[in-house]
A protein has these predicted regions:
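Intrinsic-disorder/low-complexity, polar/charged segments enriched in Ser/Thr/Lys/Arg/Asp/Glu/Gln
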Residues: 3-7, 14, 49, 64, ...
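A short, structured loop/turn motif at beta-sheet edges
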Residues: 10-16, 43, 70-79, 109-118, ...
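A solvent-exposed, acidic/Ser-Thr-rich amphipathic alpha-helical stretch
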Residues: 36-50, 59-61
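Hydrophobic ligand-binding cavity/cleft-lining segments
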Residues: 1-38
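Hydrophobic-ligand binding "helix-grip"
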Residues: 56-114
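Beta-strand elements of well-folded, non-transmembrane domains
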Residues: 12, 86, 125-127
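A conserved amphipathic terminal alpha-helix motif
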Residues: 99-102, 124-150
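Hydrophobic pocket/interface hotspot
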Residues: 17-21, 27, 50, 69, ...
């Protein structure tokens, strides 16, 4: 497992960037960089289970991640603990594939920089997915910046 880090300076206050990153409609827009049709079910409230979903590019069936919000400090920090996967619409936290994701964290930090916001993303990734996320995350953050600054 490797830890990856990405950041982007966005010319807007933290609350605006926070909502653009986490509210349903803008989330669906900026996460197209990961998977066309991405969305989530659940809440960003601390302790809540949240499902990150979208069509599986190979099967067309619903797939994604089962996760828990480990921490939520409004406009400051979100910590997502991945618990497993969703395959064909079914949650899986026990298979070998699902266990690879268990205890992986994805953290978003929002820092004020003279009225702009520096978004930092830290995530734990299996070696086989490093290249994919190194390509997708910068695209996603650029799309988020574009949405907020337009």
């Amino acid at each position: 497992m490797q830890k990856l880090h990405f950041s982007m300076l966005i010319n807007a206050p933290k609350d605006i960037v926070w909502h653009a990153m986490l509210d349903d409609q803008p989330y669906r827009e900026w996460t197209k960089a990961f998977n066309e049709g991405s969305y989530y079910k659940g809440s960003w409230e601390k302790g809540s289970t949240i499902l990150f979903l979208g069509p599986d590019p190979n099967t067309g069936e619903e797939g994604g991640m089962v996760s828990r919000i480990a921490e939520n400090k409004l406009y400051e920090f979100i910590s997502i603990e991945h618990l497993g996967i969703v395959q064909n619409g079914v949650e899986d936290t026990t298979s070998e594939v699902a266990r690879k994701w268990a205890s992986a964290f994805e953290n978003y930090m929002f820092k004020d920089k003279d009225g702009a916001t520096e978004v930092h993303v830290d995530l734990d990734v299996e070696d086989e997915h490093v290249e994919m996320f190194n390509e997708m995350w910068p695209k996603g953050l650029r799309k988020l910046k574009e949405l907020v600054e337009k």
